[in-house]
Amino acid sequence: MELFWLEHKKLWRKKIVKICVLLCFVYYVIFGSILSFQWFGFGSSDDYTSAFGNNFDGYTVIKDSQEYALSFGGELTDETLQQIVSDYQQMEADGMEEELEKTDWQIVNSWLGTLYPELRDTSNYKTMISYVDPDKLTGFYERRQQVLDEFLEVSGQVGAEKEYLHQIERKVEKPFRYEWVEGWSTLLGSMVADLGVVMALFLGIVLSSLFAGEWHDNTSTLVLTTRNGWGKIALAKILTGFAFTVELFALLAVSSIISQLFFMGTAGWDMPIQNIKLIAVAPMNMLQAEIYEYAFVLLGAIGFAGIVMFISAAVKNNVLTLLLSLAVVYGPMMIAEYLPYEMQKALDLIPLVGSSTDIFRTNTFRIFGKLIWSPYLLITIPVLIGILCMPFAIKSLSLIHI
């Protein structure tokens, strides 16, 4: 334990570590969360052509949007949808453009496009919510089931796989609860989901020197001949790497959650994720989805840390270790679209390469003849990969010692 604390203090004393943690915090928490809520994502706009020209009033817009959504009764039924669309059209007709910003028009418009494609007027430049006849918006859940079946058929997910996904979907409670959806859509679709990609860069920079740095600083001989032995030193460094990973995650996640609670509170936590993507099959509410996404990032980051430490022990060069580590994550992301679908799914099992947003998808793996929904594997395999890398990292050091 004493060696661990020494290595831990040694790591945190490095200026590059402090700079990386600060930059990561500023990028993800300040820009990616606080300013995104208050300005970039939810600040009101003077017109619908503004992108980054939003006003600095996101908190007020979010609270107004939540209050407006509550006026529709809490359950999503045909009547609720008709009322939402009718109310939007009335506000638009009255020229109440500022009031339109507090509606869930983007989410509702995606529902209309998915469930009522026959009502789309291709000659009309406006969004569907602006012109569809509310009285024709009936059979919401029957249409959703039909769209889901058609999607599975088109995706080639038939037979046993289709039935397996239906078994998962039957656990989804209906009718759906309805509150303000857009905030949760942004939170789960990008804010939390992008955390792993951000952490990968800074973990690569910090941990690449954990073992390789000893050769760079010409202290490898001292490390390998210390009275504690290379084995204990290696274990202390490995524990330090994992501890730093958890600490960085905790700093970012806790800060982001505090920001989320300040701006959004807990309103809408019990809505199903189907409000974001209708054909999702996961029986999860928003809170459960957020917990999954954070767990995905944490376990993936631990797995990635294991890979970085293995490369650092084997390569013994800071720069090369960093490049190889980043290639592990960003390389598959860049080439995935050019690969066969099954190979894309396999690459998703690499730590931090896959996406926590797979909970919105219907991807499955078939292992030894048994179907497994992809989110189950995406949260377990990456951390196992990182842990399995540790014996090889220690072995690399032992070979050098010999």
Where are these regions (language model features)?
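Secretory targeting signals
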Residues: V26-Q83, E92, D133-E214, L235-A314, ...
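Alpha-helical transmembrane segments of multi-pass integral membrane proteins
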Residues: K136, Q344-S398
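Hydrophobic alpha-helical transmembrane segments of integral membrane proteins
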Residues: R227, I238-A243, L324-L352
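Conserved small/polar residues in nucleotide/adenosyl-binding loops
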Residues: H401-I402
